[in-house]
């Protein structure tokens, strides 16, 4: 089962259930509106596996090369839950831990492995896992402290930019965010057609969103 096994024993109080609904609505709205991200398939607040809710996205076709525009929109989508919680409730929760881990890993790869940082430039360094498995086990880090600091700064910059774009997206579409969340509280699960109907759009993202995807990290 793609969405995992339903965890029927989990009973959330009304406040937590509303928070989960807005968290998943943030992901779903970003998936529906970011033109380069994987499109929305389904969103649910039924606890499954280790998750209290889930937003499923599916690529329209197999992807073997990841473009920078795609990665940047995916980061916005990943941060959608955390940003939605902050906008609605005025603070974030621990529920975004996995989202943050995945977003940080993606931003790190963009800078360290894929040459997608203008400041760091067209350079690549293997991950620690690759070093440990390879012949350079005792070699250690192969770049300077200054470069290490620059890499950290660029990773943070990419994530901060994604967070800012996500805040702009959700604030400008606050009515849609509320509509998705309230519908989830009633129906618990929505497919992509239902979400797009709540947002008043077709499956293709609205025109005018290009400015949200054009800023460089």
Residue ranges of each PLM-predicted region?
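Short intrinsically disordered, low-complexity coil segments enriched in acidic
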Residues: 1-5, 24-27
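P-loop NTPase nucleotide-binding/switch module
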Residues: 2-14
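Soluble catalytic regions of large protease machineries
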Residues: 11, 15-22, 28-217
């Amino acid at each position: 089962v793609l969405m995992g096994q339903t965890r029927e024993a989990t009973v959330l109080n009304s406040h937590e259930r509303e928070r989960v609904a807005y968290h998943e609505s943030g992901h779903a709205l970003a998936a529906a509106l970011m033109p380069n991200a994987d499109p929305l398939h389904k969103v649910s607040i039924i606890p499954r596996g280790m998750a209290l809710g889930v937003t499923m996205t599916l690529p329209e076709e197999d992807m073997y090369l990841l473009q920078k525009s795609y990665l940047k929109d995916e980061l916005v989508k990943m941060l959608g839950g955390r940003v939605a919680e902050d906008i609605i409730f005025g603070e974030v929760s621990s529920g975004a831990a996995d989202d943050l881990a995945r977003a940080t890993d993606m931003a790190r790869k963009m800078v360290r492995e894929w040459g997608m940082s203008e400041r760091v430039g067209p350079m690549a360094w293997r991950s620690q896992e690759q070093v440990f498995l390879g012949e350079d086990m005792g070699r250690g880090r192969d770049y300077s402290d200054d470069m290490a600091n620059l890499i950290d700064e660029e990773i943070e910059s990419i994530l901060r930019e994604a967070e800012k774009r996500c805040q702009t997206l959700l604030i400008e579409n606050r009515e849609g965010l509320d509509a998705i969340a309230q519908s989830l509280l009633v129906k618990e699960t929505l497919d992509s057609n239902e979400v797009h109907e709540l947002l008043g759009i077709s499956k293709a993202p609205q025109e005018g969103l290009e400015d949200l995807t054009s800023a460089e990290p």
